[in-house]
């Protein structure tokens, strides 16, 4: 259900992420250890992966 997808809550001034494990499932089907890491991936790859759901994919 795409209604549940949302944009990651990003602080794009951040260049590193904490190590807190709070997994989320990205719309690319990849589990990210936390939302910050999804943001960094988007920034690095110039993509706009959404948050599919909380918890692993």
UniProtKB/Swiss-Prot annotation:
Keywords: Disulfide bond, Protease inhibitor, Secreted, Serine protease inhibitor
InterPro entries xref list: Kazal_dom, Kazal_dom_sf, Prot_inh_Kazal-m
Disulfide pattern: 10-39, 17-36, 25-57
Signal peptide limits: none
Domain spans labelled Kazal-like: 4-57
Other notes: This protein is unusual, with respect to the other mammalian SPINK1 proteins, in having an extra N-terminal residue.
Keyword Membrane: no
Localization (cell): Secreted
Site (Reactive bond for trypsin) location in chain: 19-20
Alphabetical list of PANTHER family matching this protein: SERINE PROTEASE INHIBITOR, SERINE PROTEASE INHIBITOR KAZAL-TYPE 1
Site entry (Necessary for sperm binding), positions: 21-22
Protein's recorded name: Serine protease inhibitor Kazal-type 1
Organism annotation: Canis lupus familiaris
Gene name per UniProt: SPINK1
CDD domains: KAZAL_PSTI (cd01327)
Free-text function comment from the UniProt entry: Serine protease inhibitor which exhibits anti-trypsin activity. In the pancreas, protects against trypsin-catalyzed premature activation of zymogens.
GO molecular function annotation: serine-type endopeptidase inhibitor activity
SUPFAM superfamilies in UniProt: Kazal-type serine protease inhibitors
Gene3D superfamilies: 3.30.60.30
GO cellular component assignments: extracellular region
């Amino acid at each position: 259900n795409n209604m549940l997808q949302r944009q990651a809550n990003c602080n794009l001034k951040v260049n590193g992420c904490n190590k807190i494990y709070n997994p989320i499932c990205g719309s690319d089907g990849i589990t990210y250890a936390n939302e910050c890491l999804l943001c960094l991936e988007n920034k690095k790859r110039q993509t706009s992966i959404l948050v599919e759901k909380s918890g692993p994919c």
